[in-house]
Amino acid sequence: SFDIDQTLNIAKTPIPDEMAFLLSECLNEFEICPISGKKFEQFLIQIVNRLVEVADVTPAQLAHLHLFAAQGTQYYRYQPTANCNDGSTYDEKNWEQVYNYPLTEDEVAKITEALESSAKEVGYWEEDKLQPGDEIVENRLSQVTFSALGQKAGTEAKYAWDPDCKKRNLIAKLAKEKVPDFSFEVAGTTSINAFRDGLNKSFGMNHLMEELNVEKDDILYFGDMTQEGGNDYPVVQMGIDTITV
């Protein structure tokens, strides 16, 4: 199982050719389970499309790729023969949502207000740096994500904004004090993922084990935010073998 940004690829960019070929080989031997705070569409852009276009991954191989979006609160798997497909060609419509645990409108509003007000309190609400059409706080259905510079900011700017995580740790701490029923975890380069308490990556990994009928000892996890407060840390706490990259 893998985190995505800073683990498989540079933040917010598609996986490189070398990684696409490596994952293609792994799909012949293992069940591959990326788990991230990203929304489903980003999994397609950053991973699936690259596997198909660069590494010529087949629908049969994709049946072994399990996408756990929004920290694992959404799970998608590929059905090669769905929609009258004979299984010989890839069709994006054949991704099936197995489950989803969406936030209510009221929960989204509470989290959004807590993140925005906390960032403004400490001077880290940088709306003036957004590109046209971009936003700092994004509703990802089962999760709300704060991206300090927006989704469209350049990679260099993102890396430079909070390399030691101190800005986001402070925002997350303040937001948690405002709405204690929710969790706030640092992720990626400029992000904070917010969700109901307990619906972190350990929730996703537990569902992964249930869906694939495997035990903790069967899993090897790769991630970059394995420190306390990072969004990979709950996996470490579960006792799953973890490699920090």
Residue ranges of model-derived segments:
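Active-site phosphate-binding/coordination module
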Residues: 14-133
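Conserved acidic, metal-coordinating active-site core of Asp-based
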Residues: 124-220, 231
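Short loop/turn segments at strand-loop or loop-helix junctions that form parts
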Residues: 1-5, 69-73, 78-80, 140-141, ...
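A short, Lys/Arg-enriched amphipathic alpha-helix followed by its capping loop at the start of a domain
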Residues: 1-2, 18-30, 178, 211, ...
